[in-house]
């Protein structure tokens, strides 16, 4: 394809599984080559702040909004492409925490010995 382009993408890791499935299909259909850097949100923000440039960035909505405000992304190019759920997991045999209300969730989090998140 004579009009094929190389498209540079910066993406946070939340979309990686679906992305790795879809990009080869896109490349085959269009002839374009997609080069992607996957990183966490803070890593992506640092790369952009350090002046790295990309044709497309894929991040959570608030992070994209921050890039728009910083002049690193064009406001009318923002498109929501996915919804993300949040889950709680506990070790096998541990009691299930009460997260049925905002107050119960707050109490559970404050009582936790440790919390891991990504």
Question: Could you tell me what each predicted segment is?
Answer:
Residues 2-116:
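N-terminal segment of the mature folded domain
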């Amino acid at each position: 394809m004579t009009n094929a382009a190389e498209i540079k993408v910066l993406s946070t890791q939340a979309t990686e599984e679906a992305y790795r499935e879809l990009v080869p299909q896109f490349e085959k259909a269009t002839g374009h080559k997609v080069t992607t850097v996957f990183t966490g949100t803070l890593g992506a923000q640092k790369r952009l702040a350090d002046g790295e440039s990309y044709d497309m960035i894929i991040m959570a909505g608030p992070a994209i909004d921050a890039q728009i405000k910083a002049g690193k992304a064009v406001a009318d190019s923002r498109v929501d492409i996915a919804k993300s759920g949040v889950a709680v997991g506990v070790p096998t045999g541990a009691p299930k925490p009460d997260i049925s209300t905002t107050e119960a969730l707050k109490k559970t989090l404050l009582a936790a010995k440790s919390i891991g998140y990504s």
